[in-house]
Regions:
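Conserved, well-structured beta-alpha core segment at the onset of a catalytic domain
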Residues: 5-31, 35, 81-105, 248-253, ...
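Single conserved hydrophobic/aromatic residue that forms the stacking wall/gate
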Residues: 389-397
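Catalytic adenosine-cofactor/nucleotide-binding cores of aminoacyl-tRNA synthetases and other
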Residues: 217, 243-385
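Active-site cores that bind ATP or allylic diphosphates and position pyrophosphate for catalysis
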Residues: 96, 100-263
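Conserved adenylation A10 loop of the ANL superfamily
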Residues: 12, 157-159, 271, 388
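Charged, often glycine-rich, active-site loop that binds/positions anionic groups
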Residues: 47-62, 119-120, 124, 252
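A glycine-rich helix N-cap at a beta->alpha junction
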Residues: 62-80, 94
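N-terminal catalytic cores of NTP/NDP-binding nucleotidyl/phosphoryl-transfer enzymes
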Residues: 1-57, 199-221
Length: 397
């Protein structure tokens, strides 16, 4: 099972959503079958940097390195060898914090190491057939310049989107026009990469991918990539198209814009499990993702834990928290809703967990922090939410 990540910007909550949802599918497969399963988290870090993201420092540094592979662009945060590596590490750090099990794959690494070489040769052998699939979907002007292969310019280091003038299948080379001068390059070892739709199909082919989910905006790409992988001799993976996350204004969440709530913000306000629940719910429905939605999701999570106590095995399998907790549903009794807890913070002016617990114990006797770990965490989150939102006159209902 594969998940994809385009590291042109910092990882956002939608990126996490793919891994979380795919992990839930893996968990279900393990209970249903004895098939070996693995999640591949693939980073398209050899893509050229098309534009400077809004939410990074040293924009002028990135401006000077536009069109280079992301792993050849300097890191504006000055922590890693490249911008691509920085964003890859941010993704891995987050996924590791959630204890996801995955196998990280770097496009740059697989191209440059030669891992993709044999698959690239298959693409070259089927060059004409692939062009016949792609060209009818393009405008007349784009048809004149399109090529499945994108050479890396030996002078500028840019990923070149230019037409290929000639191919040599026996020597595994392509010939292209570089500012009026014909240049030839091997398709092997990272000297070029593939255009997106062809690259996606080649990746499925090379990595033997059986399943991949993708955003609604990639449905047309998936259709073409499916035609390509069938052309080159393998079965396409099963797919699932999910609706996109929107910010408060109803705009698509973008890695480069950094709009909507961030991963770190959600985890500041609520538990990882509540975020996983949000990912589970209604994947075919476009959902706004902003700060006020957090408390509602937490309350949904608490309600589902309560319902699980009285459910039989079949009903439990249909309960989202079974998937959120990889079948190990917690048994804790819920003391009050998160919304009620937030209101208690506001009315009591509690400024610490200890003080808020005192008010909670007035509401419900004979309870302790030790016996209620989920609620104890909620008390801490409530204090955080209070000082970042309630004090700013934002209302939770």
């Amino acid at each position: 099972l594969q998940t994809g990540y385009g590291p042109s910007g910092l990882p956002h909550i939608g990126t996490f959503g793919e891994v979380a949802r795919t992990s839930m599918i893996v968990n279900a497969l393990k209970h249903l079958t004895d098939l070996p399963t693995e999640i591949i988290t693939f980073s398209d870090d050899m893509d050229g940097l098309r534009k400077v993201p809004d939410n990074v420092p040293q924009k002028e540094l990135l401006e000077k390195n536009l069109h280079k592979p992301l792993t050849n662009v300097p890191d504006p945060f000055q922590k890693f060898n490249s911008f691509g590596e920085h964003n890859n590490e941010m993704l891995k750090k987050f996924l590791n914090n959630f204890k996801f099990k995955y196998n990280f794959k770097s496009s740059t690494s697989l191209y440059k190491s030669g891992f993709f070489n044999s698959s690239l040769q298959v693409i070259l052998e089927n060059y004409d057939g692939i062009m016949n699939i792609i060209l009818p979907t393009l405008g007349k002007e784009r048809q004149k310049t399109y090529s499945p292969f994108l050479p890396i310019c030996p002078v500028t280091g840019h990923v070149l989107e230019i037409p290929v003038k000639n191919i040599n299948k026996e020597k595994s080379i392509i010939v292209f026009d570089n500012n009026g001068k014909d240049l030839e390059t091997s398709i092997y070892d990272g000297n070029c990469k593939l255009q997106w739709k062809v690259d996606w199909a080649m990746r499925w082919y090379a990595l033997d991918v059986d399943f991949e989910m993708y955003g609604k905006d990639l449905i047309e790409s998936a259709i073409l990539s499916t035609k390509i992988i069938k052309l080159i001799g393998k079965t396409n993976p099963s797919g699932f198209a999910y609706e996109l996350f929107l910010d408060e204004k109803g705009e698509k969440i973008s890695k480069s814009k950094g709009n909507g709530i961030t991963i770190d913000q959600w985890l500041e306000y609520a538990s990882p499990e509540s975020l996983s629940l949000y990912m589970y719910q209604n994947p075919k429905r476009a959902k706004k993702l902003y700060k006020e939605i957090v408390s509602k999701t937490v309350d949904d999570y608490l309600d589902l834990i309560e319902k699980a106590k009285n459910q039989n095995e079949l009903q439990l399998l249909m309960n989202p928290v079974w998937h959120v907790h990889n079948s190990l549903v917690p048994k804790e009794n819920m003391i009050m809703s998160f919304s009620m807890l937030l209101n208690l913070v506001e009315t009591s002016n509690a400024d610490s967990k200890e003080l808020l617990w005192k008010f909670v114990k007035k509401y419900k006797k004979d309870i302790s922090e030790k016996d209620n770990p989920i609620f104890d965490n909620l008390v801490g989150y409530a204090i955080t939410v209070s000082y970042t939102h309630l004090r700013a006159h934002e209302t939770y209902v």
